[in-house]
């Protein structure tokens, strides 16, 4: 595992480091915003020799694709700018989880003093719901089906990036798309087979997790045994009180040669240029196909 703590120079998109033990509406600079209606993925237009890197963005618990994009907009712009000189064009695809949350599901929720409209529903969603009694993930199959549809709508993806619960999902997606990984028979492996079909049997170039954590249900351990081979970058917040550091490190321990960065913040995606730079360097390193991808 490669572990780095501190601040990277924004002037160095690919910093020198040392090693230690769903549907889309296309916006400016090829950024995609998820909606809940189907539309086809657009074709390249006027990008010249730029290589597109399609990155599926998975939001956290109580968020949506729209909200996640709003929170990472500055990060998008910086990444696009840093990669422009080397002719890489990141395409950010935002999907929204299918499981709607009520206000009472939101941690720390307090009823408003003034009554709200009876039909009021916040834009809060989840990829799955944890059953506290059994530890299993309810509605995970629905979450994965939404991701599979997003991949089909995009005509395949090259990478995945997730925050918090979305980070846990990103790890599962990356693992499931590794063609050499054995999948369980029957229902337990159907969601993974659906992902492979959606991405035409292609593995991912890389995966990025912000405040991600290990999915612990026994039925999902095939994703971590053997370790995830897909190149992975993990951002941990030194002041994160929502996802305990041990939970995040349990995930990094299940990844082969992970790159781990610790930022001096809490439970959020750091979007400043100094933290966008190492992400841009990681995309630069792994964005190009190094060998033909395996087919099913």
Give, region by region, the residue ranges found by the protein language model.
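Serine-hydrolase catalytic machinery in alpha/beta-hydrolase-like enzymes
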Residues: 52-156
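Acidic catalytic loop of the alpha/beta-hydrolase fold
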Residues: 215-216, 238-243, 267-268
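Gly/Ala-rich beta-loop-alpha elbow adjacent to hydrolase catalytic centers
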Residues: 161-166, 170
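Short alpha-helix in the alpha/beta-hydrolase fold that links the catalytic acid
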Residues: 70-72, 221-222, 244-253
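C-terminal catalytic histidine-bearing segment of alpha/beta-hydrolase fold enzymes
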Residues: 257-296
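Active-site nucleophile loop of the alpha/beta-hydrolase fold
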Residues: 97-98, 208-215, 265
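Short beta-strand/loop motif that positions the catalytic acidic residue
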Residues: 234-236
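Short glycine-enriched nucleophile-adjacent loop
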Residues: 170-179
């Amino acid at each position: 595992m490669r572990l780095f703590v501190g601040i990277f120079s924004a002037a160095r998109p690919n910093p020198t480091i040392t090693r230690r033990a769903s549907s889309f509406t296309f916006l400016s600079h090829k950024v995609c915003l998820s909606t809940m209606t189907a539309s086809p993925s657009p074709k390249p237009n006027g990008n010249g020799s730029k290589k597109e890197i399609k990155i599926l963005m998975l939001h956290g618990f109580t968020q949506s694709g729209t909200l996640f994009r709003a929170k990472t907009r500055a990060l998008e712009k910086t990444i696009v700018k840093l990669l422009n000189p080397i002719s890489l064009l990141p395409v950010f695809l935002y999907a929204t989880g299918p499981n709607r949350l009520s206000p009472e599901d939101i941690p720390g929720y307090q009823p408003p003093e003034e009554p709200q409209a009876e039909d009021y529903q916040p834009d809060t969603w989840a990829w799955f719901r944890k059953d506290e009694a059994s530890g299993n993930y309810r509605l995970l199959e629905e979450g994965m089906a939404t991701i599979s549809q997003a991949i089909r709508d995009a005509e395949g993806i090259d990478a995945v990036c997730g925050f918090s619960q979305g980070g846990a999902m990103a790890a599962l997606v990356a693992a499931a798309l590794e063609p050499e990984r054995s999948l369980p028979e029957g229902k337990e492996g159907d969601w993974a087979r659906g992902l492979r079909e959606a991405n035409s049997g292609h593995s991912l170039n890389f995966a990025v997790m912000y405040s991600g954590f290990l999915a612990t249900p026994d039925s999902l351990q095939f994703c971590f045994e053997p370790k995830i081979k897909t190149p992975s970058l993990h951002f941990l917040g030194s002041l994160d009180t929502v996802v305990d550091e041990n939970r995040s490190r349990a995930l990094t321990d299940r990844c082969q040669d992970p790159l781990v960065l610790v930022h001096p913040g809490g439970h959020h995606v750091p979007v400043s240029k100094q933290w966008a730079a190492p992400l841009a360097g990681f995309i630069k390193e792994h964005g190009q196909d190094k060998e033909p991808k395996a087919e099913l």
